[in-house]
Amino acid sequence: MQELEERIQSEGTVKAGNVLKVDAFLNHQCDVRLFDRMGSAWAAHFAGKHITKILTIEASGIGIACVAAQHFGNVPVVFAKKAQSINLDGDQYTTTVYSFTKQKEFPVIVAKKYLNAGDHVLLIDDFLANGKALRGLIDLCEAAGATVEGIGIAVEKGFQGGGDALRAEGYDVDSLAIVESMNPETGEITFRH
């Protein structure tokens, strides 16, 4: 998506440790108009799929997923929680994922009443690096017997291999911007097309 690539080039910052900071428009301050166009792009890509639910992970995927849901007939959005809470009651699906950004493992939890065997799920997230967070969401869907129809990603770090691995497993991954390389010393960002 050219508009997203341009925003990354003009407003993104490359940090040491393969970190791309895009908090001006994606994951701290949210550009809702951009999110709307992202949702439209995913709706076009996944037009042949029967999406009944969108699943993301807290926190940065929530805004993108909610806006995107409007392009899929306002299907429900479920977000996996990263910690047990008194608000989470009843039976749950739980798995553990490793966060590249936070450099630690954490549980991800979804109440069983919100993820079902009849669901056809679109996974959405802001970033895809090594694919661990998405693997956790896939595990939750498998535990529920739900079908993963596709994966929508705002920014994929192509050089970290997570997207390529998921595609090799047969998942339909639609990343709107794929960063091929980035240099923290020069700030240069190269995209895969």
UniProtKB/Swiss-Prot annotation:
The protein's name in its UniProt record: Xanthine phosphoribosyltransferase
| Reaction(s) this enzyme catalyzes, per UniProt | XMP + diphosphate = xanthine + 5-phospho-alpha-D-ribose 1-diphosphate
Places the protein is found? Cytoplasm
Q: In which pathway does it act?
A: Purine metabolism; XMP biosynthesis via salvage pathway; XMP from xanthine: step 1/1
Q: Does the keyword Cytoplasm apply?
A: yes
- Can you supply one Gene Ontology CC term for this chain's record? cytoplasm
Please give the Gene Ontology molecular function terms for this protein: xanthine phosphoribosyltransferase activity
